[in-house]
Design a protein with these regions (language model features):
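Conserved hydrophobic core element of enzyme catalytic domains
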Residues: 110-222
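A glycine-rich phosphate-binding loop feature that marks nucleotide/adenosyl-phosphate handling sites
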Residues: 21-26, 79, 94-102, 157-162, ...
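An anion-binding catalytic pocket shared by soluble metabolic enzymes
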Residues: 1-68, 73, 162-188
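Contiguous alpha-helical scaffold segments within structured protein domains
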Residues: 46-144, 216
């Protein structure tokens, strides 16, 4: 619990969560990525295209073409999916989001969703290309064939719903742990056709660095 609280304190801007289910065990994370936020009273929604990653020390520098293209794929997918549902999304300006020791490219997408169930929007959006690639069906087949480990809850979403609203956040950079002191950390990178393998590895290490620093050598990996 102490490690989770320390991690939460490093991400005050994120959706911070800790949960347990008998089927999936205990998890915690701090997600900056809104998959869907619906206000049921006004029938309005917010989602975002969050992709492209660099260390915070690069703040102020131009974003690389690879990162811009990666984020553009996610943005276009979300917008096209919303149009396919009969919605009229408004696409905001792309900006830089700082979360912990890294930065992402962020485009907020908003609109009205009267007549469309929030669960239908969730099902259509998830998973975005940031989690599974594109085209989605072919990418999911490749993940099933080539990945040697189960993703379990990683890449899904954590959803909080009541009579007034629904908010779902992507389960990114998260940890599965047990009471024996064992931890399994999940992070990922966005690979494009022109990606450099060493750069992608460095990006993944940057994403994992804060969690690794907190967990350190105190525990055993699952």
């Amino acid at each position: 619990m102490a490690i989770a609280v320390d991690y939460f304190n490093l991400h005050p801007e994120a959706f911070r969560y800790l949960y347990y289910t008998p089927q999936h065990g205990a998890w915690f994370g701090a997600s900056p990525e809104i998959l869907l936020d619906c206000d049921k009273a006004t029938d309005t929604f917010v989602t975002m295209a969050l992709a492209g990653t660099r260390p915070v020390i690069d703040d102020g520098k131009p974003w690389s073409g690879k990162n811009l293209a990666e984020q553009g794929v996610v943005r276009d997918y979300i917008v096209d999916t919303l149009y396919d549902l009969g919605l009229q999304p408004h696409v905001g300006k792309t900006e830089t989001l700082t979360t912990g020791n890294i930065q992402h490219l962020l485009t907020r997408i908003t609109g009205h969703c009267e007549g469309v169930e929030s669960t239908a929007i969730l099902s259509a959006l998830n998973p975005t290309p940031a989690l599974c690639g594109w085209p989605r069906a072919a990418a999911l087949e490749d993940i099933i064939e080539y990945e040697r480990h189960p993703r379990r809850c990683y890449g899904g979403y954590v959803c909080v719903e009541n009579a007034r609203s629904l908010a779902a956040y992507v389960n990114l950079r998260c940890v599965n742990f047990d009471n024996a002191g064992r931890w399994c950390m999940y992070v990922g990178g966005g690979i494009m056709a022109d990606s450099d393998a060493a750069d992608e590895w460095d990006e993944t290490c940057h994403k994992a660095a804060l969690l690794q620093g907190l967990i350190g050598g105190k525990t055993e990996s699952i």
